[in-house]
Curated annotation (Swiss-Prot):
One Gene Ontology term of the molecular function aspect: toxin activity
Signal sequence annotation: 1-33
Protein name as annotated: U3-scytotoxin-Sth1h
Location in or out of the cell: Secreted
Keywords annotated in UniProt: Disulfide bond, Ion channel impairing toxin, Knottin, Neurotoxin, Secreted, Signal, Toxin
Keyword Secreted included in the entry's annotation: yes
Cellular component annotations (GO), alphabetically ordered: extracellular region
Description of its domains: The presence of a 'disulfide through disulfide knot' structurally defines this protein as a knottin.
Tissue expr: Expressed by the venom gland.
Disulfide-bonded cysteines: C46-C60, C53-C64, C59-C69
Length: 71
């Protein structure tokens, strides 16, 4: 192998490794951010009374009656 082909091989490996690292970090950030975003939305929804609901668990410790949350 010539010096140019070795350098080219190393650069190709570095680019693939960097891309893999970026994708891995993005996946980890997404998996952490999604539950936090859901908790934030749920906490905001819990502060509002009279929201539509289907079950008691939809009402954040309230009671679902006639498709609306009662507190």
């Amino acid at each position: 192998m010539s010096q140019n082909s070795i350098t080219s091989y190393k650069m190709g490996f570095a680019k693939h490794f960097f891309l893999f690292a970026v994708l891995l970090c993005a996946t980890a950030m997404y998996s952490v951010a999604e539950p936090a975003q859901e908790r934030l939305i749920e906490s905001i929804a819990c502060m509002q009374k009279g929201l539509p609901c289907m079950e008691h668990v939809d009402c954040c410790h309230g009671v679902c009656d006639s498709l609306f949350c009662l507190y």
